[in-house]
Amino acid sequence: MAIREKVFNTIISCFKRHGAEVIDTPVFELKETLMGKYGEDSKLIYDLKDQGGELLSLRYDLTVPFARYLAMNKITNIKRYHIAKVYRRDNPAMTRGRYREFYQCDFDIAGHFDPMIPDAECLKIVHEILSMLQLGDFLIKINDRRILNGMFAVCGIPDSLFHSTCSTVDKLNKATWEDVKNEMVGEKGLLPEAADRIGEYVRLHAGGLGLIEQLLQDPKLSQNKLAREGLGDMKLLFEYLTLFGIADKISFDLSLARGLDYYTGVIYEAILLQPQNARREEPVNMGSVAGGGRYDELVGMFDPKGRKVPCVGVSIGIERIFSIMEQEVEASKEKIRTTETQVLVATPQKNFLDVRLNLISELWDSGIKAEMLYKKNPKLLNQLQYCEDTGIPLAAIIGEQELKDGVVKLRVVASREEVDIPREKLAEEIRRRLES
């Protein structure tokens, strides 16, 4: 839990730095609220039935409930964050950070703004969080649903198959192109020639402005209105990312599809990279740790008059991050402190419980994080051992002589250095030592 608390604090501080306010939404929704929003992943939604026969579902993510919240409260402009549990009928795999109940950490910007400015800020937030958590090298892959849909159109894919084709392309990060093509042709009903044309495009990745310019010159793609719009916005986005100083960690990747039905524009996914070595020329993808995109039409689905509120957001894959950090701590044999206690109030005397209670109360009232052992007459050795076992850096020791002299013996646990401090200055001295 200490690692989790550190990660949560890091993420929340970043969200607040960018001006977000926190909101909360219910753990369960009407089933009809969630259906039709997640494509093929809808089968992973947990269904509930209450005593009156009403069909409910546990929330699958934090995005759809947020959109319903905006529509219900007629909110047209907000920057929010939300950290809460979501639920999926998935196959759990703890080593890969996959669970049926897990936390998501979401940041979203809702409102009518000039193109790509909020989108760029969301990517900047992902960059900041992954940099602060020091998880190693990472890459943020981006694409646009308009470019994908334009690509499908020029490849001869019927409109009715856009969503299912998108879900299949989304599997390219886990499967080979041959497997993906076989699914397109065998299960989705695409012609082999159409699948091959898609293959030519989705193999174009690891690009930036150069790839955007190349696609703008593509004789087929450049004639498609949706694709042109998406490429124009992608070019603008890269200009903003360059100004933010993060373009070197961004890759325009046509194979990125993100299968959720509600995305309408830019989509992105952050992956951790395993460093290259003598046997590997390329860094290896260790899995996704964040994802998100633009969803301009989702709020309108819940508004009685169909009023749209453009939104863009990102979700941090916190469970996978926990899993990685816990493995690193285990491998390093590093001892993690589970509390923030600054000082243990101790005594070598018997029958000094009242003195300890009085002193610890003074420290608590002064804002010092303090503990004591819950025994009337603990041995001093046991008290100091507790400090070492739990990583408490200081011990405030008070005995008969210290009580008579109006001082407290402050002991640095690591060095065993001891110094007498006037009792009224004890809290101030503890702060000074810990700050230095």
What are these regions (language model features)?
Residues I142-C155, D170-T176:
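Short, conserved secondary-structure transition motifs
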Residues G39-E40, V154-I157, V412:
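Short secondary-structure boundary/capping segments
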Residues I23, V27-L56, P92:
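Polyanion/phosphate-binding surface patch
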Residues A2-H18, E29-E32, L62-K74, I78-G136, ...:
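Positively charged, Gly/Ser-enriched RNA/tRNA-binding surfaces
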